[in-house]
Amino acid sequence: MKKFLAFVMAASMALSLAACGGSTPASSTASTTTEATTEAAASGSKTDVAFVTDVGNIDDQSFNQYTWQGVQDFCSANSLNANYYRPTEDSDAARLEQMDNAVNDGAKAIVVAGYLFGSSIAEAQAKYPDIQFLALDVSTADLGDTAPTANTALITYKEEQAGYLAGYAAVTDGYKELGFLGGMAVPAVIRYGYGFVQGADAAAKELGVTDINIKYWYSGGFAATDEVKNKMDGWYSEGTEVVFACGGPVCQNCDAAAQANGGKMIGVDVDQSGQFDTVITSATKGLAESVNTALTDALNNGWKFTDAYAGKQTVLGAAENCVGLPMSTSKFTKFTQEQYDAMYAAIVDGSLVIDDSFDADVHPAVTNVTVDYQS
């Protein structure tokens, strides 16, 4: 876990960046970003590796920032030029436009993150067969009827493992009134939630308690709204102690409600302890490490993915040090590093198997916790 946590800690540093649009990218050949430039890197190209953001900015302290950090780290280590490109709007056309701009700037590889890129990747991979496309948190299903081609590598994560660790840790640490706030009921969010429930139930069994309650709700979207804020205010005021907030900006609503009511929150995807004071831990993905490993695979093979990644969806989890809890920044009072290490090792060696189902209508079986699934 040390290598994974190193990436998490490095990526948590805030980046002060200007948004970029059109064909003028922000440029970097190191781990800090400079102003846009037309100066070529040592490779002779203005852009070697491009990162196309989602509609958020590059300093979002979430997927964009951590994925970009991975691109920067890789390019810095290999004397390559990294640039990011921000779509002007939330549409497939805008995403494709920035991919076009990256190719025109000489990109050999284009990195994206998030299921919204499914359709644009499906089109771009055929349009640019010599460009390598690395898509994090994008599954084969997100590409619709189009299969990933040899120049496309899809990476998804075993969110259920990270969710399980978070739920187990929370109950072991003494929390009895828990909540799960999901955004849209997409597979990744569902796996986080179901893992959380399974982990909480496992800890309750070990402790021999049956008084653990979990409120569970999908907001239906990832935007911060008054509806979500009011819902979270209600939960905390009714006695909920900690909520696993899983859904991008909805975390802002959860944090505001937690602050107002003296509650706590569990972050998601990246270590959010530096963003929200209410966070006791975060269920994280090794975004930067994933980027580095996959791009190194392509670079070492003449800028072509090997069979390890080419034309397939690779699912990463604890065995690859790509999901977990950032224990160095966690605020547990009872749950220990030793307990975490033992649980993590059990997941890695297969002695602990976590259900990875993601049917929103089929809930995980539990024995020692009571789950209130709300609509």
Where are these regions (language model features)?
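Positively charged n-region of N-terminal signal peptides that target proteins for export
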Residues: 1-8
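Extreme N-terminal leader/targeting regions
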Residues: 7, 25-26
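Repetitive helical segments and hydrophobic/amphipathic motifs
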Residues: 11-12
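C-terminal motif of bacterial Sec signal peptides marking the signal peptidase cleavage site
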Residues: 16-19
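Bacterial signal peptide processing site
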Residues: 21-23
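A residue-level marker of the well-folded mature domains of exported/periplasmic proteins
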Residues: 27-375
